[in-house]
């Protein structure tokens, strides 16, 4: 497996990966901003391809390839510490638990999205992507990596636990349009040492 930086040509696949990793939240956000006649995936793809101010901009992604084929990707960022003040009254109710957990992760490197394409799952590639994400976190100067996972996503939860991640906090998932998930959102973290 080889890793490389994301390019504008990856935007279509990255939009699918981001939505899969985000369990439909990205698609819902994109639906709010798509203009008439534009699909929400088209909006999301264009945002990843061209919005260099956005966290999900293609250059912020690491792409995993096997035999020159994209098999998965991830991106993350260092969470500001102190965390910026947020007026929760201006946020959608369903989004608040995610923001609260991100605030708890202040100072860590937050793995915002990670996913392996379906045809490559079950072969250990997620562990390799996770290890590379930990390298990126260390390179950012932090000693802790964090991530959010829905408890209903048992496969991901088992992967993170088996790789040394532990629960730090949890919040109840508030359903949003497009959502079919229930349960809690779990903030997990791992100390990376020196």
Predicted segments — roles?
Residues 107-109, 121, 130, 137-148:
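Conserved GNAT acetyl-CoA-binding A-motif
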Residues 78-113:
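Conserved acyl-donor/pantetheine-binding loop and adjacent beta-alpha core of acyl/acetyltransferases
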Residues 63, 69-78, 110, 115:
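Conserved beta-strand in the GNAT
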Residues 24-49, 60, 84:
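Conserved GNAT-fold acetyl-CoA-binding loop/helix
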Residues 116, 122-139, 158-162:
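Conserved acetyl-CoA-binding loop-helix of GNAT-fold acetyltransferases
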Residues 48-63, 79-84, 110:
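A short helix-loop-beta-strand connector motif used in the catalytic cores of GNAT acetyltransferases and
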Residues 93-94, 143-146, 150-157, 162-163, ...:
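C-terminal "cap" of GNAT-fold acetyltransferases
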Residues 2-17, 22-29:
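A short beta-loop-alpha structural element at the N-terminal edge
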């Amino acid at each position: 497996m080889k890793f490389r930086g994301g390019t504008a040509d990856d935007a279509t696949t990255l939009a699918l990966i981001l939505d899969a990793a985000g369990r439909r939240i990205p698609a819902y956000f994109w639906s709010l901003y798509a203009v008439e006649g534009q699909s929400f995936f088209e909006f999301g793809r264009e945002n990843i391809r061209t919005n260099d101010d956005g966290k999900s901009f293609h250059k912020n992604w690491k792409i995993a390839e096997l035999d020159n084929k994209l098999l998965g990707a991830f991106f993350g960022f260092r969470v500001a510490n102190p965390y910026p003040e947020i007026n929760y009254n201006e946020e959608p109710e369903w989004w608040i638990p995610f923001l609260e957990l991100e605030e708890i992760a202040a100072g860590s490197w937050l793995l915002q999205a990670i996913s392996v394409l379906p045809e490559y799952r079950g072969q250990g590639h997620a562990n390799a992507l996770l290890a590379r994400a930990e390298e990126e976190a260390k390179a950012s100067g932090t000693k802790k990596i964090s991530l959010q996972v829905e408890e209903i996503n048992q496969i991901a939860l088992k992967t993170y636990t088996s790789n040394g991640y532990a629960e730090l906090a949890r919040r109840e998932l508030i359903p949003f349009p497009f959502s079919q998930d229930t349960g809690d959102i779990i903030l997990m973290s791992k100390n990376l040492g020196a």
